[in-house]
């Protein structure tokens, strides 16, 4: 039995009844039953208070009579269940990703203990995480979450412990974990778990789980660098993953001297909803600009859209990120298939939504300050009718009266008109229109989520699309332009292979070994590692950096397209024995093209959204100042 399979069997031993516990005792008399109840209630309250106090001391590292390194064993000991629950409540709200949750736990507790005690903690953590983040593929079964957490702990050890006697490739990790999950629930959503496990693997590979140090141990070395034990390589990969700074190199973004950035913790969708439920102010997702005060409360602008719509919700089954992160699979293709015109895989590929009208729900939606607010209504009265003046209600009244309320942060989202709106005639009898909002994969509880909204007309759909893309462009981090590791691996298009080295003989293709191309980071994986911090940039810097980034991506696309004819010429002129290598090389080329093109299309949408907002602001100023406009006409 493998370690992953044993995850389900690591439980505390069943309690045995002692002879004393098996003896029947006299039932209480009615005269003192109230006294017993009161004593029991008082004892329960005292127990809760004591458990909270002990949990707080463990969190602070000040619990007496228990060694700091024994806290986990103490929490997992039978009889300390209430203390464990209170300790985990101190970690609320839990991150929406399981790796983020484990990272938060191991940053708050010295998480080395006996297997049974660790298992008890993970079981309680699984229950709490699932109650806060009810992701569909977990089937409301905490045991599935428990298995994944245990698997990630094992993976963390094998990836970062030099003395470990085994190691997992990403394929082995996924296969072993899926097998363990299927033994618990045979009908699990394998594609969803595969995507999540792939992202978890890369997250832990880039940065191991922290090991909490006692309060007396310094967190920083004399050099000023944090002593996290990860080493320079891990830190370098993490910097590439987060891309929170504009590195001044030829392959990165260059900020102006006047650019401004503020580093803050990223507010997750779970945190936003937690704050809303508890009537706490939401965290700012952007830096205020002077024009925000003028336009942020003006409905029908890139700054604010608020209206009644119909909404459908769906999850993406596939995206190119999961394809790029998956293991290479050789496809059966004919040699000449690569000469066909390539079909662009853009961000505008639409999700399959159910056409049944019963799936539509009435909702008031509001896009404002980097967030999407959704108030769903089921109807009122016997006829289940929807009041016509909901759009005039205060937000607090909407929150109290709606059947369901949720707020979503717009990091990395893309809004687009549904294709049927674009091709429909303006004189058509169809008055309504639809638009989509797609959330990136790997981003907290919204991973792969997609909404379809039906508006009153096409103009309103366009306004919602522009507003969503404006805020996404403004708050989303811009990744590094470097898309692959600098290495000596051959993918099928290196200058050495296509042109030959100067003064040397042509490369023997029979001896060429092609590696599987994959990006330095997945299309959306940048968002999954942003629990620790994110840089907020002023508007001009974000706009300027988007221009630089899209230009760099465009240049890389042109450069990549230029090598394809050379590859075809090199490989196609050889005999049939080279066909497998030719197909592998073209598969690599295609994967890189899809990656670059998708990044380019997405950030081009962001760039246009910010530029259109600038034009809108300039027009609004000219309307507000007609005297200036008339004076300009007189001078001309």
Curated annotation (Swiss-Prot):
Q: What are the SEC7 domain coordinates in residue numbering?
A: 1-203
- Domain named PH: residues: 333-475
Q: Name one Pfam family in it.
A: PH_GEF_YEL1
Membrane topology, as annotated, equals: Peripheral membrane protein
Q: Segment Disordered: which positions?
A: 1-29, 213-234
Q: Name one GO biological process term.
A: regulation of ARF protein signal transduction
Subcellular localization is given as:
Cytoplasm; Cell membrane; Bud neck; Bud tip
Instruction: Supply the alphabetized keyword list.
Output: Cell membrane, Cytoplasm, Guanine-nucleotide releasing factor, Membrane
Q: Name one GO molecular function term.
A: guanyl-nucleotide exchange factor activity
Q: Got a GO cellular component term for this one?
A: cellular bud tip
Please explain the role this protein plays, according to its UniProt record: Guanine nucleotide exchange factor for ARF3 required for localization of ARF3 to the bud neck and tip and involved in actin patch polarization.
Q: Which family does it belong to?
A: Belongs to the YEL1 family.
Protein's name in the database: Guanine-nucleotide exchange factor YEL1
């Amino acid at each position: 039995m493998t370690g992953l399979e044993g995850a389900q069997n690591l439980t505390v031993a069943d309690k045995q009844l002692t002879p004393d516990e098996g003896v029947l005792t006299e039932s209480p008399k009615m005269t003192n039953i109230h006294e017993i109840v009161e004593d029991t209630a008082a004892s329960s309250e005292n127990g809760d208070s004591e458990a909270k106090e002990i949990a707080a001391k463990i969190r602070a590292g000040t619990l007496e009579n228990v060694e700091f390194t024994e806290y986990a064993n103490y929490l997992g000991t039978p009889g300390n269940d209430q203390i464990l629950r209170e300790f985990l409540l101190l970690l609320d709200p839990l991150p929406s990703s399981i790796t983020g949750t484990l990272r938060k736990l191991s940053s708050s507790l010295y998480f080395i203990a006996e297997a049974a005690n660790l298992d008890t903690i993970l079981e309680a953590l699984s229950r709490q995480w699932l109650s806060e983040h009810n992701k569909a593929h977990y089937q409301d079964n905490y045991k599935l979450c428990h298995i994944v957490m245990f698997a990630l702990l094992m993976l963390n050890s094998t990836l970062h412990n030099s003395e470990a006697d085994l190691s997992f490739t990403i394929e082995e990790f996924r296969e072993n974990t899926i097998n363990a999950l299927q033994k618990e629930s045979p009908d699990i959503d394998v594609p969803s778990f595969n995507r999540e496990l792939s992202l978890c693997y890369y997250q832990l590979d880039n940065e191991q789980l922290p090991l909490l140090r006692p309060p007396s141990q310094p967190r920083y070395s004399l050099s000023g660098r944090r002593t996290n034990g990860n080493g320079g390589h891990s830190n370098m990969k993490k910097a590439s993953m987060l891309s929170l700074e504009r590195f001044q190199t030829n392959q990165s973004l260059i900020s102006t001297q006047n650019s401004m950035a503020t580093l803050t913790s990223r507010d997750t969708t779970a945190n936003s909803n937690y704050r809303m439920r508890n009537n706490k102010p939401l965290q700012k997702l952007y830096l205020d600009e002077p024009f925000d005060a003028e336009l942020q409360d003006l409905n029908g602008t890139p700054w604010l859209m608020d209206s009644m719509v119909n909404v459908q919700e769906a999850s993406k089954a596939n995206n190119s990120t999961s394809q790029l992160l998956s293991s290479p699979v050789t496809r059966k293709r004919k040699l000449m298939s690569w000469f066909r015109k390539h079909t662009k895989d853009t961000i505008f590929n639409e999700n399959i939504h159910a056409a049944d009208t019963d799936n539509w729900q009435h909702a008031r939606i509001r896009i404002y300050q980097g967030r999407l607010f959704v108030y769903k209504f089921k109807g009122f009265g016997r006829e289940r009718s929807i009041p016509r003046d909901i759009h005039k209600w205060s937000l607090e009244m909407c929150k109290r009266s709606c059947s369901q309320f949720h707020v979503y942060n717009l990091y990395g989202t893309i809004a687009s008109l549904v294709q049927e709106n674009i091709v429909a005639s303006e004189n058509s009898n169809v008055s309504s229109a639809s638009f989509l909002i797609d959330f990136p994969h790997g981003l907290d509880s919204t991973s792969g989520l997609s909404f379809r909204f039906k508006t009153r007309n096409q103009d309103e759909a366009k306004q919602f699309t522009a507003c969503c893309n404006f805020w996404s462009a403004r708050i989303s981090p811009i990744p590094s332009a470097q898309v692959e590791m600098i290495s000596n691996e051959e993918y099928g298009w290196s200058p050495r292979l296509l042109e030959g080295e100067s003064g040397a003989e042509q490369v023997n293709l029979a001896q060429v070994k092609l590696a599987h191309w994959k990006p330095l980071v997945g299309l959306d994986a940048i968002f999954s590692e942003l629990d620790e911090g994110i840089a907020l940039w002023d508007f001009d810097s974000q706009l300027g950096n988007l221009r630089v980034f899209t230009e760099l991506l465009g240049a890389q696309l042109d450069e990549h397209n230029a090598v394809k004819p050379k590859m075809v010429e090199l490989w196609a002129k050889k005999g049939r024995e080279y066909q497998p290598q030719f197909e592998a090389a073209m598969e690599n080329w295609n994967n890189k093209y899809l990656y670059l093109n998708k990044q380019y299309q997405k950030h081009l949408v962001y760039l246009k959204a910010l530029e259109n907002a600038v034009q809108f602001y300039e027009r609004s100023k000219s309307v507000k100042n007609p005297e200036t406009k008339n004076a300009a006409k007189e001078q001309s």
